[in-house]
Design a protein with these regions (language model features):
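Short strand-edge motifs at loop-to-beta-strand transitions and within beta-strands
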Residues: 79-83
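Short, exposed beta-strand-loop hairpins at the edges of beta-sheets
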Residues: 85, 96-110
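Short, surface-exposed alpha-helix to beta-strand junction/turn motifs within ectodomains of secreted
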Residues: 45-69
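Short beta-strand segments within Ig-like beta-sandwich modules, predominantly Fibronectin type-III
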Residues: 72-77
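Bacterial N-terminal signal peptides that target proteins for export
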Residues: 1-7
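N-terminal signal peptide c-region/cleavage motif recognized by signal peptidases
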Residues: 17-19
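Extracytoplasmic/periplasmic copper-protein system
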Residues: 23-27, 33, 38, 106-118
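A glycine-anchored, Pro-Gly-centered beta-turn/N-cap motif
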Residues: 89-95
Length: 118
């Protein structure tokens, strides 16, 4: 019995989409991606679409002068990664994250947020 080409293509596309959805992508962050906040936050929180593997997931935050302001290793619980931040004053903060989901696929990304009236 032969499977028609359209059905086979649909099945392959469906499987590929399911596999891509299994990765841990950033769902939301606090402070929000691209936002401006009045004062430097004491903590950064990242929530992902899948649970994370704590030993292989990380985040690095640099302040307006380019120096790291993340305060040590992030705390990871389920799909949430949190790290304390050292205040570095007004300006643009850069966040770069790397996540390994429990399905062993890695993702990474970066974004900025602003402190003060910029």
């Amino acid at each position: 019995m032969q499977i028609p080409t359209a059905i086979a293509a649909s099945l392959i596309t469906s499987l590929a989409t399911t596999a891509a959805q299994a990765h841990a992508f950033l769902d939301h962050a606090n402070p929000l991606v691209g936002s401006t906040v009045a004062a430097a936050p004491h903590e950064l929180s990242l929530s992902f679409t899948q649970n994370l593997e704590p030993s292989f997931s990380s985040v690095e935050v640099t302040g307006p002068d380019g120096a790291r302001v993340d305060a040590g290793k992030p705390q990871i619980s389920g799909n949430t990664m949190r790290v304390g931040l050292k205040a570095a004053g007004p300006g643009t903060y850069h966040v770069h994250w790397h996540a390994l989901s429990v399905d062993t696929h890695t993702t990474q990304g970066s974004f900025t947020f602003h402190v003060g009236g910029q």
